[in-house]
Amino acid sequence: MADTAVARRPSAPTTGRLYVKAIFTGFKRGLRTQSEHTSLLKLEGVFNKEDAGFYAGKRVVYLYKAHNKTLKTGHTVATRTRAIWGKITRPHGNAGAVRAKFHHNIPPSALGKRIRVLLYPSNI
């Protein structure tokens, strides 16, 4: 029975991402009508309405690459990356989907693509 102390090495600070991944699944719709001003997002790791309610009011962003580079205000280098910002308004259904409204409507080419759900503003 040797009492050897195990030397613990301090772990490196882990830098995680500050957003939750979501998939743009479509627009809010009825049987024959579609509302392009409201998008439906399926959040990764969220499976019920109560968990989806936590994300109400959080900011969302759709990042995409454009054809031409432009210089944004406050930056010194031109980039092709563009962003469309929005906000989660409420849960949708019972399976963890949410509704989001964007400042400019999301293009249909974004169906099935990634959306970032930022964890601010925080309500905890």
Curated annotation (Swiss-Prot):
UniProt-recorded Gene Ontology molecular function terms: structural constituent of ribosome
This protein's record includes keyword Disulfide bond: no
Cellular-component GO terms for this entry: cytosolic large ribosomal subunit
PTM sites of type N-acetylalanine: 2
UniProt similarity note: Belongs to the eukaryotic ribosomal protein eL33 family.
Biological process (GO), any one: cytoplasmic translation
SUPFAM superfamilies for this protein: Translation proteins
Domain of life: Eukaryota
Protein name from the UniProt record: Large ribosomal subunit protein eL33
Organism: Caenorhabditis elegans
Alphabetized InterPro entries for the sequence: Ribosomal_eL33, Ribosomal_eL33_CS, Ribosomal_eL33_sf, Transl_B-barrel_sf
UniProt keyword list: Acetylation, Ribonucleoprotein, Ribosomal protein
